[in-house]
């Protein structure tokens, strides 16, 4: 079941990729993918290229994929291990969701962080109290880790 669904999602992604994202298997293992997310133009991550790993569980799509950033990113909902705090990857997951929708949700999370459900409380605090400092730090991390 899972491999048929994953193959279908891969075909759909190749035919109609989400804006500023790409994804596919890293090798022969259909359950291990790598994705690339371009930093959204209207965010401090603009110009950055962020690598993300996607690991599908054997019971996909009834369980969500494990998605993690491999590129360091300064964000209240993404920690230093690359874990992402995003409701659709946890309790709001639904089998109707796809990798494409997950990648688009991550893109919108980059543009609009959720400081009220942070994975990194210090960054959430800076985001809420000193937006200029947050944006300049996020930009400098993007230049340091996600460009070139």
From Swiss-Prot:
SMART domains cross-referenced by the UniProt entry: UBCc (SM00212)
Subunit architecture: Interacts with RGLG3 and RGLG4.
Organism: Arabidopsis thaliana (Mouse-ear cress)
Pfam families hit by this protein: UQ_con
Coiled coil: none
Nucleotide-binding as UniProt keyword: yes
Protein name: Ubiquitin-conjugating enzyme E2 30
Residue span, UBC core domain: 1-147
Tissues with expression: Ubiquitously expressed at very low levels.
Annotated GO biological process: protein ubiquitination; ubiquitin-dependent protein catabolic process
PANTHER family for the chain: UBIQUITIN-CONJUGATING ENZYME E2 (PTHR24068)
EC number(s) given by UniProt: 2.3.2.23
Similarity annotation: Belongs to the ubiquitin-conjugating enzyme family.
Keywords attached to this entry: ATP-binding, Nucleotide-binding, Transferase, Ubl conjugation pathway
Disulphide bridges, residue numbers: none
Active site: 85
Top-level taxon of origin: Eukaryota
